Amino acid sequence: MERLHSKELTAVQKNARDVGDEIHTDRHIIDPVAYDMLYLASFGINSRGKAAGQSKGQNNGINILPNSKPDEKCLERYRTNEENMKALCRMCARHFIDVLVGTTLKQAGLTLPKYWEDRIVKAVRKALLFDVERKKLCVWMDSEHIWYLPLKGIVLKDYYPSVGMRQMSDNDILFDAEAWERVEKHMLSEGYEAESVGNGNHDVYQKPPVYNFEMHRSLYGKGHDERWVEYYSDIKNRLLSDQPEVVCDAVHGASENTTANQTESVNGGNSSCGYHMSDEDFYIYITSHAYKHYSGNGTGIRTLLDFYAYLNAKEESLDFDYIQTECRKLGIRDFEKRNRRLCWKVFSSQQIYDRVSFEQSLSADEMEMLKYYLSSGVYGTFERMIENRMEKQKKTDGRGKRSKLTYYRHRVFPGMELYENYPLLVKHRFLIPAYWFYRIVRMLFSKKRRNYMWREVKAVKKVTAQESFNEQSNC
């Protein structure tokens, strides 16, 4: 597969290997285990805990359930039934919320099996190791006067009740692109391996036992929506400084809605060159990032939970006129509104344990969106990636239905968005036909690439067959 999609593919393959692809939701109703996961997650995310910037004894608008124990009918399904417990753990792991749900069960008095307890311990340990290593990196960047902006999970984790509840696989940090060589040299000197440098818009560094940093030179790049690339091309000018009195070759000032405690929590207390977005801009960014995955491989319940956690703390103070104006520019206004409405319905103070009533409370559009989240898993699925690619191609070509032939043609002869990752091909376009030949030969002599090709062919057949079946069913 091309470098443009290599990270997404790796995540999809890892997700399938770890928890299996066979878990899915019924076409008409929500799977009982999936419903229990949502029900228990709503208790976990609303449980008492210290959210970002929240002092002891303060609520800060956090929605806390008056009765924090789930219904006994739900708990009884997992108290003594090992198969039910295993199915729930696998479902939660697939969506990367097994720590949140497992902790909720423990707090309700259930004894977790060892394999689930081990996952919680490892997740908490990983979160603590990430925090220490990230602080070291930020201190070094401070000393080098390299500006940086912690992204996504680094910020969102502080809106969850306790350490490790918001599980993370890596640390995403935007930094001064002009300093990439210094950053690479430093990471290598610290024992990291450069898994990918100079490909796409971020560099990937990994080190045992768990360390994984994605150092972003830009928020979006080649292959992403051009509106997003342009919108975030001047992001530096819209950032706010964690310490406004210190200048690190960037513009910044403190967010009105961001507390000193939150800033310290995000950047480890040493943030002279650290930056953050305003609350509104951060929300817009995570919405665009969520939509990137939602419309690509798909994305799971953790994404919806992230939105609830953030909105639960911030919604009353957010300027939604500004948010909707900016989301319209990015082409994600409809997604933002639908997503915001759904996360509240799924996670806010849900205490009545009744799957049928819950399903009836959702509109047809909300039900379809929720089932899409449930069927994707945290990293999406391979078939979802193929389906969304074919749908995008159908719209681009103005066709009435998905075409296998058109899909294969674009895969063998991809557009310029792929070639732009190869400076030689951009400069000497006459070499592109030779690259086509090289890709075909490389596939013939690589078992891994041949296996991937056959897997893709099967997925394309399945997607087109499902479309034909749906058309016949609607006749």
Placement of each model-derived feature along the sequence:
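Conserved NTP-donor binding/palm subdomain of two-metal-ion nucleotidyltransferases/polymerases, i.e.
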Residues: 2-57, 61-169, 175-475
